[in-house]
Amino acid sequence: MIELALSAAVMVACLSGTVQFGYTFYIYNQLVTAVGNGGRYAAMRTYRAAAPRDIEQGKAAIRNMVVYGDARPGVGTGPQVANLKPEQVQVDWAMDESGKPSAVNVTIVGYTVDAAFGMIRFSGKPAVEYPFVGRYAPAETEQ
C-alpha cells in the first residue's frame, strides 16, 4: 500500500505538470498566431501620418487585429486569446533614413497565463518583424 501511495503521488504530479505545460504551449501557440496575423496586417496596411493622432490610430487598429482578429471589432467582441488586452500588444515602426516605414515589430508584453498550478508571464515574446510593403501616405488621415 505504501508503494501505491508513493507511486500515485509521483504519477499525479507528473500528470498535472504535463497538463500545465501543454496548456501553456496551447496559449503560446494562439499568441504566436495572433501576433503573426497582426504583423502581416500591419505590414500591408496604408501608413497614414498626417498627424501624430493618425499614427496612434493606426497602431490601435493593429493592436485590435492582434487581440480581436479585426481592426474594428464590434461591440461585445471577445479576444482571440483568453484575457489578452490591446494594452498588452506593442507596435513599433522602424523607419528608414528618409522617414518612411521600413519594418513593423509587433510584440506581446505583460501577458500572464493563469495555469492550474501557477502563473507564467510572457513579456517580449512572441514577437514578429515584417518588412513594410504597404502604401506610404504621409498626407492622409485615419478615418
What positions do the PLM features span?
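N-terminal single-pass transmembrane signal-anchor helix
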Residues: 1-23
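Active-site-proximal flexible loops/turns
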Residues: 10, 27, 44
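Short, conserved structural patches
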Residues: 33, 37-143
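Membrane-proximal amphipathic alpha-helices
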Residues: 24-32
